[in-house]
Regions:
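Asp-based, Mg2+/Mn2+-dependent phosphohydrolase catalytic module
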Residues: 1-10, 46, 71, 106, ...
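Active-site neighborhood of HAD-like aspartate-dependent phosphohydrolases
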Residues: 2-50
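Conserved SAM-binding loop
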Residues: 13, 20, 94, 112, ...
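An amphipathic alpha-helix signature
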Residues: 28, 32, 45, 49, ...
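Helix-loop "lid/cap" segments that line or gate small-molecule binding pockets
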Residues: 34-35, 55-69, 126, 157-158
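Short beta->alpha linker loops
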Residues: 51, 55, 93-97, 118, ...
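Metal-dependent phosphoesterase signature
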Residues: 61-99, 108, 163
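Short, acidic loop-to-helix structural element flanking the phosphoryl-transfer center
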Residues: 86-114, 120-126, 151
Length: 225
């Protein structure tokens, strides 16, 4: 199968958590380790899933109990960050169909990148473990690169790939990803196997383009996006 309308797309940039990788188990373990270490009640996977999408500082801020002081929050966040960077690959895995999709795009000559609100060290580890030799660029949160929906991380990846926003497709799983793509001037596809409920997304972005399986990306007419 050939990628449709290949000439209109030079690059595909993916979100990481909830799009390429199912990271919820490792994130939940790190959040709950940090909470328990500091004597706070732990959260369910469902609660943690609902907190995702705006970076790890926001994730931890949502997870701590109401009334937590700023200094206590910083201590909990520091514990989370240290634990997660050390344990971010224990249960994380690609979603079904992701590896065949990425290999197909690579074989078809499409340049690929990752843009994530995850800290750069964890993004680098996961990129190297799962996508080395397949995906060319991986941009995470670091000094000078603000979190999505600020488009700078996506624009940085696009520039590093030698593409332009007009010739890039961005693929994500959340309202944050849709907003990021629109701010950057990219075409966007939103996946429905990730961390957001389909009804939630469609009610807020009825005009967005959605897919249920990775292989659907290969059958899209990119000119209609």
């Amino acid at each position: 199968m050939q990628t449709p309308n290949r000439s209109t797309i030079r690059a595909v940039v993916f979100d990481l958590d909830g799009t390429l990788l199912d990271t919820i188990a490792d994130l939940a373990s790190a959040v709950n380790y940090a909470l328990a270490t500091h004597g706070r009640p732990v959260r369910t996977d469902g609660e943690i899933r609902s907190f995702l999408g705006n970076g790890i500082r926001r994730l931890v801020a949502e997870a701590v109990p109401e009334g937590t002081t700023a200094s206590d929050y910083e201590a909990i966040f520091a514990t989370f960050r240290t634990y997660y960077v050390a344990h971010c690959m224990e249960q994380t895995k690609p979603y079904e169909g992701i590896m065949p999709l990425v290999r197909h795009l690579k074989q078809d000559g499409v340049k690929m990148g990752i843009v994530s609100n995850k800290l750069q060290p964890a993004v680098t580890q996961l990129h190297e473990k799962f996508f080395a030799g397949l995906i060319d660029v991986a941009v995470g949160e670091r000094p000078g690169i603000p979190r999505k929906p600020d488009p700078k991380s996506l624009l940085t990846a696009i520039d590093n790939l030698g593409a332009t926003p007009e010739t890039t497709l961005y693929v994500g799983d959340s309202e944050v990803d849709i907003a990021t793509a629109r701010a950057a001037g990219c075409r966007c596809v939103t996946v429905l196997w990730g961390f957001r409920d389909e009804d939630f997304l469609r009610s807020r972005y009825p005009d967005a383009h959605y897919i249920h399986r990775p292989d659907e990306l290969l059958t899209l007419d990119f000119n209609t996006l």
